[in-house]
UniProtKB/Swiss-Prot annotation:
MF-aspect GO terms: ATP binding; GTP binding
Function: Displays ATPase and GTPase activities.
Domain of life: Bacteria
Species name: Corynebacterium aurimucosum (strain ATCC 700975 / DSM 44827 / CIP 107346 / CN-1) (Corynebacterium nigricans)
Stated family: Belongs to the RapZ-like family.
HAMAP family associated with the record: RapZ_like
Name of the protein: Nucleotide-binding protein cauri_1197
Keyword field: ATP-binding, GTP-binding, Nucleotide-binding
Residues that, per the record, bind ATP: G16, M17, S18, G19, G20, G21, L22, T23
Positions bound to GTP: D67, V68, R69, S70
Length: 293
């Protein structure tokens, strides 16, 4: 089928035992730029792949998650796989598994019932599911046993299984903010630049913002500014290497001053400029409080 050539990578179908790590696996693929459709009934998978493979679709990498709850819908996953093979649209089938005792512990830790428990014991539900998915497990292209894997280990296992995924650019968001409005809750790292002189106290600069040249020139011309930015980038490089090793490709850095209008904005823009020049990162900026009083 010619439409399949429009995908940058073969479609991935994620399935497996409930509690085996399907959600975590989906998150890894989302972080790697995949469009991930969750809890898709088997019969809908064919239409989904056809839609995303059409010339009008913006989707270049796709994965779909389907689990034992799909039994509520007509059609089986085995029938869907057969149909996809006939259409020359065979996805890579990723099956997530774990030992029964580990699955029991995971369900107990989140106080959830198993979808096939049906009023019986958790162990009975897991055994019923294992019997139901055995034939699909036998058809899997990749089986990952998550019994002894942490979330980071699972990420590395998926990246190893799908090769070049691990070589994508890291995404860095530099977010300026004002401490008086609170630090960004999603920041992985928070930097305080209130040690720099505040343009707010320079009457002719007060009405400008850090994106304006007069303020940027004032802030960046301070004796402490350039050494700080140099040292920050050196430190941040070592952090990026560690983040990559841990499979973390989306990093948010909060850069704060008092109000989020001047110093933090100017420093954020300068750091972003330097990082973009290198070409090894996908860098974006956000000035959270620049328009606030």
């Amino acid at each position: 089928m010619e439409a399949m050539t429009l995908f940058d990578s073969p479609p991935i179908l994620i399935t497996g035992m409930s509690g085996g790590g399907l959600t975590s696996a989906a998150k890894v693929l989302e972080d790697k730029g995949y469009y991930v459709a969750h809890n898709i009934p088997p019969k809908a998978i064919v239409d989904l792949l056809k839609l995303c493979a059409s010339p009008e679709s913006p989707v270049s990498k796709i994965a779909a998650v389907t689990d034992v709850r799909s039994r509520l819908f007509p059609g089986s996953l085995a029938e869907t796989l057969d149909e996809l093979e006939q259409l020359d649209m065979k996805p890579t089938l990723l099956f997530l598994d774990a030992r029964d005792d580990v699955l029991i512990r995971r369900f107990d830790s989140v106080r959830r019932t198993h979808p096939l428990q049906d009023g019986e014991t958790l162990k009975a539900g897991i055994q019923r599911e294992r019997a139901a998915v055995q034939s699909i497990r036998e058809r899997a292209d990749i089986i990952i046993d998550t019994t002894n894997l942490s979330v980071h280990d699972l990420r590395r296992a998926i990246e190893a299984s799908f090769g070049e995924m691990g070589h994508e650019l890291q995404h860095v968001t530099l977010e300026s903010f004002g401490f008086k409005h609170g630090s960004p809750r999603d920041a992985d790292l928070v930097v305080d630049v209130r040690f720099l002189p505040n343009p707010y106290w320079v009457p002719e600069l007060r009405g400008y913002r850090g994106t304006d040249e007069p303020v940027a020139d004032y802030v960046l011309s301070q004796d402490a500014a350039e050494p700080f930015i140099d040292h920050f980038i050196t430190m941040f490089d070592s952090m990026l290497a560690g983040y990559r090793h841990e499979g973390k490709n989306f990093i948010t850095v909060g850069i704060g001053c008092t109000g989020g209008h001047h110093r933090s904005v100017a420093v954020t823009e300068e750091i972003a400029r330097r990082l973009r020049e290198r070409g090894d990162l996908d860098v974006s900026t956000l000035h959270r409080d620049i328009a606030r009083d």
